[in-house]
Amino acid sequence: MTDSADYDPVCGMQVHDRRWVTTYRGREYVFCSEGCLALFRRDPALRLSHKGERARYDLVIVGGGPAGLTAAVYASLQHLHALLLARDLGGQAVDTSRIKNYMGYDLVTGPELLGRFRDQLLAQKYIEHRLDEVLSVARVADGFALQTRHGCRYEAPAVIIATGMHRRRLDVPGERRLLRRGVSYRLVHELERYQGQAVAVVGGGNSGIEAATALSRLGCRVTLISSGPLTGDAGDIARVEAAENTVVLTDHEVAAIEGEEQVNGLRVQPRGGGRERFLDVSAVFIEIGYLPNTDCVAPLVDRNRDGEIETGRDCSASIPGLFAAGDVTNGFGKRIIIAAGEGARAALAAGVFVRARQSGTASVQGPA
């Protein structure tokens, strides 16, 4: 845990205002929320030494994206003694430059929408949160035990896995070596840097088309590369194909990314073989989809051939007490609004399960 006055000593979040402040042993500490301040005041020594912490909760939620944040709010509304564990609050959605038609918004940015999610979480009174990575989830006699990267162990009768997905890689020469030196998976952080330059976008789905359109508007000379036909929104496809400064290469694959200290080009070739072409570009934005983050729980749950956790209509996984929500599941439609809805459903179902356990009532659960 970072030992800086700019970081909340309870949860590890960076604090940008000084609304909640206290002094302990001559040092001032700032907090992200009234809840974290209250936890600190109960036992300052414990909160300053997170490593090795052990605690038991009614429910532990793993993941800080739309599904996890919504699940946390709905757990709080049920007055469950719950904990949210996440590497960050926001997830992949924070990197989305434009979100269309999320209810209540015609258009909103990822940082703006997920900032509102986070603010709503921090306003809750019954949910604790920590910035930490869950390494493993194991079954124990009375539920589950979760081990974290900071050396903490938490137990609960119910767990919600809302860990989302991570970006798929091309796995071609030069990709890893030139990461952050022209190779990027996060367009929103790199836009202005490449204004007016020649760039390539790899990926023919919504994300790739959105990236190509955004770069085109900045005056970049864009080559959009897709291994098959473009598959995004029809209107967006028409716009990107009509852009004068954009070339679309379908049925092509990247063979290698070139450059020494910085990307200076890439080699592409038609699918199924054919002559390679060299494209002179200064950046490559990779937008080829995601893989589910299931490493921490993979031995426990049933997954489909894509590695997604199989869930029932109440978001239950294959083991009683274990639930999953959002993009990590086999649910149809990888959308922020769907992930948020699944987070709420999973929390409500987990609440029913926990109360049944507490009352000794049998609970039937499992994918259906």
What function would you assign to each model-found segment?
Residues A211, I319, A325-A368:
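A conserved FAD-binding loop/helix module that cradles the flavin
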Residues R54-Q124, I209-A234:
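Beta1-alpha1 glycine-rich phosphate/pyrophosphate-binding loop at the start
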Residues L114-G115, L121-T148, R153-A156, S216-R313, ...:
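A Rossmann-like FAD-binding core segment of flavoenzymes
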Residues S4, G12, W20-D58, G115-R116:
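Extreme N-terminal leader/targeting segments of oxidoreductases
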Residues A45-L46, H50-R56, M165-T213, L218, ...:
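Glycine-rich dinucleotide-binding loop and its adjacent helix/turn
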Residues D8:
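Short cysteine-rich clusters marking metal-coordination/redox-active sites
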Residues G63, A156, A162-T163, R169-D171, ...:
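Short, well-ordered coil/turn residues at beta-beta hairpins
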Residues D171, R177-R193, I286-I338, V352:
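FAD-site-proximal beta/loop scaffold in flavoenzymes
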